[in-house]
Design a protein with these regions (language model features):
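Juxtamembrane/interfacial segments at transmembrane-helix boundaries in multi-pass membrane proteins
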Residues: 92-151
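Extended, hydrophobic alpha-helical segments in both membrane/secreted and soluble proteins
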Residues: 144, 157-163
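Conserved G/P- and acidic residue-centered "switch" motifs that form tight phosphate/ATP-binding loops
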Residues: 59, 138, 169
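Hydrophobic alpha-helical transmembrane segments of multi-pass membrane proteins
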Residues: 8, 86, 129-136, 163-167
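Internal transmembrane alpha-helices of multipass membrane proteins
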Residues: 1-93, 152, 156-157, 166
């Protein structure tokens, strides 16, 4: 299931860079570094077989996206970058709590082992609700979607391409 996302991110990143080839005129080196770090974090997230590594890569994606929006974005880029960062970071706290609960119950962060583990039905319900709320911010779903319009409008074209094409999936 992750291979299509790996292919999508490795195809979309160079296309995004090409789309912004003439538009980005200042701090070009840092811009390219941010995109390559972003691509590395996305691929790491999609190939992780450990819940902790998935979480670290999933959250590390925020840093280059914050920089891409905040440095190379539009007029309200700083506001949009901080709103994006804070919303998605706060949504991730609940994900971390759910992952911690899974680790305490199963004794492992290995994703294949977690899929084989039998969680109590009540715990499954709480984990579902916790992950749903967490991903509702990340995806984004109503009513926790208000960061998205600002991030898309203020991000450079390439940042919007990655945001819409990969990260919101």
């Amino acid at each position: 299931i992750s291979m299509p996302f790996v292919l999508l991110s490795t195809l979309l990143t160079p296309l995004s860079i090409l789309a912004s080839w003439r538009a980005i005129t200042h701090r070009v080196r840092e811009y390219m570094i941010a995109f390559l770090v972003l691509e590395t974090m996305m691929v790491g997230m999609f190939v992780s077989l450990d819940m902790l590594m998935f979480y670290l890569f999933f959250e590390a994606v925020l840093i280059p996206m914050f920089l891409i929006i905040g440095i190379w974005g539009g007029a309200r880029r700083v506001y949009a970058a901080f709103k994006f960062f804070l919303y998605t970071l706060l949504g991730s706290v609940l994900m971390l709590v759910c992952m911690l609960a899974m680790y305490i119950d199963a004794g492992t962060t290995d994703i294949p082992a977690l899929t084989a583990h039998q969680f109590a039905e009540s715990m499954q319900t709480w984990l579902f609700l916790g992950f749903l709320a967490s991903f509702a911010v990340k995806v984004p779903m109503w009513p926790v979607h208000t960061w998205l319009p600002d991030a898309h409008v203020e991000a450079p074209t390439a940042g919007s391409m990655i945001l819409a094409g990969v990260l919101l999936k």
